[in-house]
Amino acid sequence: MNTVVIVDCLRTPMGRSKGGAFRHQRAEDLSAHLMKGILARNPQVNPKEIEDIYWGCVQQTLEQGFNVARNAALLAGLPIEIGAVTVNRLCGSSMQALHDAARAIMVGDAEICLVGGVEHMGHVPMTHGVDFHPGLSKNVAKAAGMMGLTAEMLGKLHGISRQQQDEFAARSHARAHAATLEGRFKNEILPTEGHAADGTLFTLDYDEVIRPETTVAGLAELRPVFDPANGTVTAGTSSALSDGASAMLVMSEQKAKALGLTIRARIKAMAVAGCDPSIMGYGPVPATHKALQRAGLTMQDMDVVELNEAFAAQSLPCAKDLGLLEMMDDKVNLNGGAIALGHPLGCSGTRISTTLINLMEAKDAKYGLATMCIGLGQGIATIFERP
């Protein structure tokens, strides 16, 4: 079985979905820009040797339809011989794309794959065209399709207070802002063309979604949006709506060494798991336990953790049951998370993995975990190991 390694990882800046910098950029443009950018950073790689492109995307319609992976590859001018497939496991789509590519490499069906994901939530809203089967309500509560209400349920089950949520959200913005000021995102962001408020073209090289002015006191003034009468989840403690793409260059360790490329991380273990759709945000817990078991490791072995912040009310129960609450400032989402940066659905899996790998390098860490919840009750996890 071949060992799978990451030789590079990149992302676009995260743009605001409502009137943001990428309002005139299409999902294919963001994706093609990254495909070209990651190959330009690694000239040792002959594009003709890429076996396949695995690209995550949730809302596969409008500009993201008709296999956005292939459309972006053609737009990027990549060799027509390279295959391309768009992968959908809802919020875990691009992490699933990584898993699919890894397995192809492990069994020898590929030596090099290009992996990533995109979501332009400004152009293709999350609920666009969604039509749940009426019979689904026989087995699943209707509210299970409303992500904010599942976060409310999970938070209540675990006794997560409004104060805790507001503090977690403020932490996300503060850490993401500090990471920006200190240049900690510089190596993972590929500057990308966008449009300023006045319509002029400019190059965006920072995440415009972060709100550095966020405070716990300010968040406390917001009203609950999903359960106005009894809820605690607000817009401020939910992941921001944003547009973005992320990419990884993945290959066998043997191929990376033959090309003289630096191995940034190995894939140690992968897992997915299901959970009750009504508390879909709990998925990272069973998925992480599976991945740890497959890796022969424990949570204490993880030096750095990226836990996707769909909602504060969702992240905190997962952190609690994974034994991470006492280690937040040492291990978890050290550069902030999706509450500050946004959660462009199909992009987020490889986005958090990219941030994780950069953090592992900065901290000289051995093991890192990237994990996320998935709508309708799933979780996905990947354990990375540095050489």
Curated annotation (Swiss-Prot):
One of its GO terms (molecular function) is acetyl-CoA C-acyltransferase activity. The active site is at C91, H343, C373. GO terms for cellular component: cytoplasm. GO terms for biological process: fatty acid beta-oxidation; phenylacetate catabolic process. Keywords: Acyltransferase, Cytoplasm, Fatty acid metabolism, Lipid degradation, Lipid metabolism, Transferase. Transmembrane segments: none annotated. Pathway: Lipid metabolism; fatty acid beta-oxidation. The keyword Lipid metabolism applies. Its EC number is 2.3.1.16. Gene3D superfamilies: 3.40.47.10. It is an enzyme of class 2 (transferase). It is found in: Cytoplasm. It catalyses: an acyl-CoA + acetyl-CoA = a 3-oxoacyl-CoA + CoA. Coiled coil: none annotated. Catalyzes the final step of fatty acid oxidation in which acetyl-CoA is released and the CoA ester of a fatty acid two carbons shorter is formed. NCBIfam families: AcCoA-C-Actrans, fadA, PRK08947.1. Belongs to the thiolase-like superfamily. Thiolase family. Heterotetramer of two alpha chains (FadB) and two beta chains (FadA). This is 3-ketoacyl-CoA thiolase.
